[in-house]
Swiss-Prot record, chain B:
The lineage of its organism: Bacteria, Bacillati, Cyanobacteriota, Cyanophyceae, Synechococcales. InterPro entries: NADH_UbQ_OxRdtase_su1/FPO, NADH_UbQ_OxRdtase_su1_CS. Keywords: Membrane, NAD, NADP, Plastoquinone, Quinone, Thylakoid, Translocase, Transmembrane, Transmembrane helix. Its EC number is 7.1.1.-. Pfam families: NADHdh. It is found in: Cellular thylakoid membrane. One of its GO terms (cellular component) is plasma membrane-derived thylakoid membrane. This is NAD(P)H-quinone oxidoreductase subunit 1. PROSITE patterns: COMPLEX1_ND1_1, COMPLEX1_ND1_2.
């Protein structure tokens, strides 16, 4: 007769207190030795009722609040928060404001991907890149601080019809400096990480999502593009002024953690490309003597033109969201960030449904965790790029 | 080969000079080397901890410890003192006996292994015939302690960490022993003194690293795995198992694990320098130089100089290796458990076996160069 050892599966509770649970995600993992048999994510530890709060705030009251959804990407949250009533009320945004928005969003995309890269590398065991990404991210925060007065969150920069303030004097030069500084740093990351044999073995072929699966599970962002779908809302929806800039959608076909890594690294480079063009093409130029020019040349000044303003119209506290409903979305660093807004001809929205990218991307986790090793849980979870503030809202 | 300084004899003779009987003099001598070794090992650990923090800080563009003493050199001492005064927590439903015994079993063999580390011709606690074998034998006790503490903690992470530690130690002991065996075959001895003696005489060219280019790589990888250093720190992988078998430990028991792992690192570096880098041997054959200059090898100042140089060389070589280990730790990601075991069993083991066979063949073919 054959002798065999029978082992009972072990149920391991990972999180919400666990060094690599990216906040307060809880995974109930069933293990057979080192193999994952099943995994059940438990979410909601950071639920703060963001949607309900929106229903009792005017837009201008709500904007400072929204950077707590996805606290690694506050600008995206602010952008979608003002885009929703803008699209519903058909408010036109000046070109200059659009360019400023695009620059801010792309800076945020870089910051978002940087804050993905560090923890992801830590998840596979390399602690050092975490410190490098902070070095670069600080510079983006310096730029934000100069423009909006705040660094990580609470930028409170986006307004219905434009942005809160124009860029300060010399900001464009500093931003250009950052672009010059940043690209060699990306090369540095790639030198350290991309061809590291241990890293490659840890992420290649791990957590593979096929093209069909990615579409069927409603994935978006780098998760979707890593699986070979060339889908980027910046190209698809033509929002802001992305159409006027020359850039490519980065995608990979392998669908594993390494493909997602590659997509994000290339998107950082692509973002730098976008920022550089936007800085050059910004209507009204880089220097903020527009106000002086307007005063000097009087009312008929070409600088008084609509497109040269940073905001179409200061939003009144009594701005009423018109009756009607609309789904507005944009491409955040994590994927499709959308708002389903229902107006009731009131200063408050009647319904404010947030479709966050990482909440939808996280759904596939139990599915791709089956049969992997314990260590792969972290690599796969890290590659999804979740922020629990955005998952739980 | 000159015998150099013999501390034991000089000590005994000086005590007898005070009128003590030889037996009593011997009794005075006995605890001295052990105390010296424990102090030496502990100070070595403090230095390594400081180095680890400073080098990792440099790699990560931080400053590292800087307030405790000049350049923060006292930081490890401060950490140690803090750990001593911390509450000793034993988790509920843990097995208190095994829980306490685990760290002890991990630390003791590592300190014991210092018995066989030579710093000079006579600067070794015991020159036993089975020297290097004793180290290998002692190092396989540690996983029992790790498994014990992992099992006794009543924590699933600890259990997984303990099991990983056991699997890892067993898998990497074999290639490690085979690499050592190749050296032993060339030296015709298991004694660490003989192994160094056999390498000396030709300066840096005589060191085993040239004759064992594959062996030293195997040894280094296996030694890193035995020390549970990144990229092989799976038993305590923070991102996966929180802290592995150490999860439930606090205070002095945790400090024992910490101490044990660093003592083990220093020890592995010392053994590596003994096996492959000529131990206390200077890169230039100094004895020939002394002969050439016409200084007799028995001159006392020359002997003191050589002994001091020997200790410096051994320590320098080991700290160079420790530096590499630290830099590696802060550069590379961690391997996965199946990759770790595959590397051990499917790659290192056959390569180590082949290395042993080739060494044997070379020894038969070129007895001059390979210690026939």
């Amino acid at each position: 007769t054959k002798i065999e050892t029978r082992t009972e599966p072990m149920v391991l509770n990972m999180g919400p207190h666990h060094p690599s649970m990216h906040g307060v995600l809880r995974l109930i993992v069933t293990l057979d030795g080192e193999d994952v048999v099943d995994c059940e994510p438990v979410i909601g530890y950071l639920h703060r009722g963001m949607e309900k709060i929106a229903e009792s705030r005017t837009n201008i009251m709500y904007v400072p609040y929204v950077s707590r959804w996805d606290y690694a990407a506050g600008m995206f949250n602010e952008a979608i928060t003002v885009n929703a009533p803008e699209k519903l009320a058909d408010i036109e945004v000046p070109k200059r404001a659009q360019y400023i928005r695009v620059i801010m969003l792309e800076l945020n995309r870089i910051a978002n991907h940087l804050l993905w890269l560090g923890p992801f590398m830590a998840d596979v065991g390399a602690q050092t890149p975490f410190f490098y990404i902070f070095r670069e991210r600080e510079m983006i925060y310096d730029l934000w601080e100069a423009a909006s007065g705040m660094r990580l969150i609470n930028n409170n920069y986006f307004r219905v019809g434009g942005v809160a303030v124009d860029l300060p004097y010399g900001w464009n030069d500093k931003c250009e400096d950052f672009c010059d500084y940043f690209l060699p740093k990306v090369d540095e990351y790639e030198k350290l990480i991309t061809n590291n044999p241990i890293f490659r073995r840890r992420v290649e072929g791990v957590g593979t999502v096929t093209r069909e699966e990615a579409i069927n599970w409603g994935l978006s962002g780098p998760m979707l593009r890593g699986s070979g779908v060339k889908w980027d809302l910046r190209k698809v929806d033509h929002y802001e002024c992305y159409d006027e800039l020359d850039w490519e959608v980065q995608y990979e076909t392998a669908g594993d953690c390494f493909a997602r890594y590659l997509v994000r690294i290339r998107e950082m480079r692509e973002s730098v490309k976008i920022i550089r063009q936007a800085l050059k093409a910004m209507p009204g130029g880089p220097y903020e003597n527009l106000e002086a020019k307007r005063l000097q040349e009087g009312k008929k000044s070409e600088w008084n033109d609509f497109q040269y303003q940073y905001i179409a119209k200061k939003v009144a506290p009594t701005f009423k969201i018109p009756a009607g409903e609309h789904y507005v979305r944009l491409e955040s660093g994590k994927g499709e960030l959308g708002i389903f807004i229902q107006g009731n001809d009131d200063v408050f929205p009647w319904r404010w449904k947030i479709r966050s990218a990482d909440f939808n991307n996280l759904q596939i986790l139990p599915h791709i965790l089956k049969g992997v090793k314990v260590a792969d849980i972290m690599a796969i979870l890290g590659s999804i790029d979740i922020i629990m503030g955005s998952v739980d809202r | 080969m000159t015998s150099g300084i013999d501390l034991q004899n000089s000590f005994l003779q000086s005590l007898q000079g005070f009128g003590l009987p030889p037996g009593l003099a011997k009794l005075f001598w006995i605890p001295l080397p052990s105390i010296l070794m424990i102090i030496g090992a502990t100070v070595g650990v403090l230095v390594v901890v400081w180095l680890e923090r400073k080098i990792s800080a440099a790699a990560q563009q931080r400053i590292g410890p800087e307030y405790a003493g000049p350049l923060g050199v006292l930081q490890p001492v401060a950490d140690g003192i803090k750990l001593v005064f911390k509450e000793d927590v034993v988790p509920a439903k843990a097995d208190p006996w095994l829980f306490t015994l685990g760290p002890v079993l991990v630390v003791l063999p590592v300190f014991l292994s210092y018995l066989i580390v030579p710093f000079g011709q006579n600067l070794v606690i015991t020159d036993i015939n089975v020297g290097i074998f004793l180290w290998i034998a002692l190092s396989s006790i540690a996983p029992i302690g790790l498994l014990m503490s992992g099992y006794a903690s009543n924590n699933k992470y600890s259990l997984l960490g303990g099991l990983r530690a056991a699997a890892q130690s067993i898998s990497y002991e074999i290639p490690l022993s085979l690499a050592v065996l190749a050296i032993v075959m060339m030296s015709n001895s298991l004694s660490t003194i003989d192994i160094v003696d056999q390498q000396s005489g030709y300066g840096i060219l005589g060191w085993n690293i040239w004759r064992q280019p594959v062996g030293f790589l195997i040894f280094w990888i296996a030694a890193l795995a035995e020390c549970e250093r990144l990229p092989f720190d799976l038993p305590e992988a923070e991102e996966e198992l929180v802290a592995g078998y150490q999860t439930e430990y606090a205070g002095m028991k945790f400090a024992l694990f910490y101490l044990g792992s660093y003592v083990n690192l220093v020890l592995s570096a010392l053994v590596f320098s003994v096996l492959y880098l000529g131990g206390w041997d200077f890169p230039i054959p100094l004895e020939n130089v002394a002969n050439w200059l016409g200084v007799a090898p028995t001159t006392s100042w020359l002997q003191v100089l050589m002994a001091a140089l020997g200790i410096t060389m051994t320590v320098l070589k080991s700290y160079f290796l420790i530096f590499i280990a630290i830099l590696l730790r802060w550069t590379v990601p961690r391997v996965r458990i199946d990759q770790l075991l595959n590397l051990g069993w499917k790659f290192l083991l056959p390569v180590a076996l082949a290395n042993l066979l080739i060494t044997a063949a070379l020894k038969l073919t070129f007895p001059m160069a390979f210690g026939g």
